[in-house]
């Protein structure tokens, strides 16, 4: 072991592992972690927003620990694994002389640092990207059947981590088009497809909900150079912190001397260019480009080994980065260290305040898939995120969580109220109000399907009831939400629908009723889409229909 990994390397790796464990234990969850913890309460082959790997890791962690570490333990393990694999991917024999430089380089990469203890889909994405590159490198040197099989399994694991993983596989393939004639490469693809088939089946059974949301239904906004394209370049700087100059310098200086280096360059440039083009359509989130951290770490470390000037400055700035990031990690635990409130601050406090007033009564959070799992994690009580026309669908829209609150006394929390039976305060000072409701009932899974008008402006509306019980039509009120071309809701109007059969008073279980309607004229100009929603029992209308593009 010490022949491959120097003693100093193993010592620093152990220190890093302990640091991440301590950090993971004392840092409160961020909202996305709470949401993925909610995933893990019911393991499945897929979820609304992401493939299931993050939920699987959280489930494994929960077998070993309770609390925050029960969410994060496997992230700490995978982080160590990523460091080990990256070290193995460095061929330069002089690397043993620069162990400290190696750790400073990786520790300075801000998001890689954070994903050393936070559990998000990008955590396994980083690990399996590194492992995929290691297997691909071995495949280039010795393309055996077993290497192909293992590579196929890892390709599937990549895709189970996050859909962005397709970019890793695509750009590595583009760097070596001869793979298309390599039967061992096709074996890897076949193994990957077989391993990934349960998720394909889940997508099919759930009407490809994840793909449709990410590609078509996700709201956008008007293009802004500052927010979109310039913001993207800021993100490219932010992921490498103070070492960004030397990381990109190493990328520019590296020449494609072999197929593996060519793969690293194609992967890095490919992802950067892909999201640069995407930035003209929508805002690119920082973590979307995190996968370039793996190939650039290899390129940057090889560069610093051979370039004394870069090595000197990367070492100096790496120490500064380490100090800054350690202080930032302390601030994640202890908020007074900086005058900024972050997601890891005060969650236990607001949950405790709300729980003291609501007791064991389930809480329904309107339009908040973030607050609902956070409250459930720290209180242990049932929650539900009720989504309406001003929000978006999420995991609560497709699972059975609605049944946990049906016909029960609940507390309904919404940011739209200015008074209520109880209040609680978020760490940022925002006051939320909640009201008690008896015998709560919602029908958020009713489906509204709009058919194109055959004559003039009359549309056909099909309303499908997926529930195991019948629903009285008198409880349902219809609305149409108009949105701009970016799918941002701007106006909502009550909708009059006419049933095809006037004798129908019940929407039976697993049945569909047909209605006719004419679109009311909106006040807004430049409308792009409309969406039909159903308001039941006095609630705001839901997301029962899909956005329908209006013809000009």
For each predicted feature, which ranges?
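Membrane-interface transmembrane helices that cradle and orient dolichyl/undecaprenyl
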Residues: 92-96, 132-147
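Membrane-interface alpha helices of multi-pass inner-membrane proteins
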Residues: 42, 135, 146-162, 174, ...
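Transmembrane-helix motifs of polytopic, lipid-linked glycan transferases
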Residues: 73-95, 108, 131
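Membrane-proximal, lumen/periplasm-facing interface regions of secretory-pathway glyco-
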Residues: 311-360, 368-389, 412-416
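Short acidic/glycine- and proline-prone juxtamembrane loop motifs at membrane-interface regions
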Residues: 114-125
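Transmembrane-lumen/periplasm boundary regions of multi-pass, lipid-linked membrane glycan transferases
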Residues: 157, 167-261, 276
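Short helix- or helix-capping micro-motifs
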Residues: 102-110, 155
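Extracytoplasmic catalytic/substrate-binding loops of multi-pass membrane glycan-assembly enzymes
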Residues: 24-36, 45-57, 65-69, 206-209, ...
């Amino acid at each position: 072991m010490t022949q491959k990994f120097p003693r100093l390397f193993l010592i620093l790796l152990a220190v890093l592992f302990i640091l991440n464990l301590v950090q993971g234990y004392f840092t409160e969850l961020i909202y996305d972690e709470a949401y993925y913890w909610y995933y893990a309460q019911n393991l499945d082959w897929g979820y609304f927003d992401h493939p299931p790997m993050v939920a699987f890791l959280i489930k494994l962690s929960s077998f070993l620990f309770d609390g925050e570490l029960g969410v994060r333990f496997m992230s700490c393990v995978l982080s160590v694994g990523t460091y080990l694999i990256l070290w193995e991917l460095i061929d330069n024999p002089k690397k043993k002389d620069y162990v400290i430089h190696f750790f400073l380089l990786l520790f300075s990469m801000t998001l890689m640092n954070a994903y050393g203890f936070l559990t998000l889909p990008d955590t396994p994405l980083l690990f399996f990207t590194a492992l995929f590159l290691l297997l691909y490198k071995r495949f280039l040197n010795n393309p055996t059947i077993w290497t192909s099989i293992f590579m196929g399994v890892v390709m599937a694991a990549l895709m189970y981590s996050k859909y962005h993983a397709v970019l890793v596989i695509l750009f590595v393939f583009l760097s070596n088009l001869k793979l298309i004639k390599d039967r061992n490469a096709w074996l890897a693809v076949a193994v990957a497809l077989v391993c990934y088939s349960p998720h394909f089946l889940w997508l099919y059974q759930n009407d490809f909900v994840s793909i449709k949301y990410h590609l078509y239904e996700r709201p956008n906004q008007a293009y802004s150079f500052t927010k979109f394209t310039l913001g993207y370049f800021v993100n490219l700087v932010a992921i490498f912190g103070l070492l960004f100059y030397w990381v990109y310098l190493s990328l520019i200086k590296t020449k494609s001397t072999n197929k593996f280096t060519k793969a690293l360059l194609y992967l890095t440039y490919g992802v950067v260019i892909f999201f640069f083009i995407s930035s003209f359509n929508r805002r690119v989130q920082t973590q979307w480009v995190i996968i370039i951290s793996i190939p650039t770490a290899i390129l940057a470390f090889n560069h610093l080994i051979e370039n004394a000037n870069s090595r000197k400055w990367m070492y100096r700035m790496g120490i500064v980065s380490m100090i800054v990031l350690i202080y930032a990690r302390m601030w994640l635990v202890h908020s007074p260290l900086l005058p900024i409130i972050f997601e890891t601050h005060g969650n236990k406090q607001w949950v405790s305040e709300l729980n003291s007033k609501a007791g064991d009564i389930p809480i329904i959070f309107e339009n908040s898939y973030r607050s609902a799992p956070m409250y459930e994690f720290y209180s242990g009580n049932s929650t539900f995120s009720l989504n309406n026309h001003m929000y978006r669908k999420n995991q609560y829209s497709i699972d059975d969580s609605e049944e946990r609150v049906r016909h029960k006394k609940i507390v309904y929390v919404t940011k739209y109220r200015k008074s209520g039976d109880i209040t609680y305060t978020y760490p940022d000072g925002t006051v939320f109000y909640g009201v008690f409701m008896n015998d709560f009932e919602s029908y958020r899974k009713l489906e509204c399907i709009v058919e194109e008008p055959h004559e003039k402006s009359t549309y056909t509306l099909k309303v499908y009831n997926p529930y195991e019980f019948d629903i009285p039509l008198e409880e349902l009120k219809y609305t149409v939400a108009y949105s701009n071309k970016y799918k941002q809701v701007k106006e909502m109007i009550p909708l009059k629908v006419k049933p095809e059969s006037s004798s129908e008073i019940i929407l039976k279980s697993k049945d569909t009723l047909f209605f006719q309607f004419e679109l009311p004229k909106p006040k807004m100009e430049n409308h792009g889409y409309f969406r039909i929603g159903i308001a039941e029992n006095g609630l705001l209308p839901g997301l029962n229909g899909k956005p329908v593009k209006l013809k000009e």
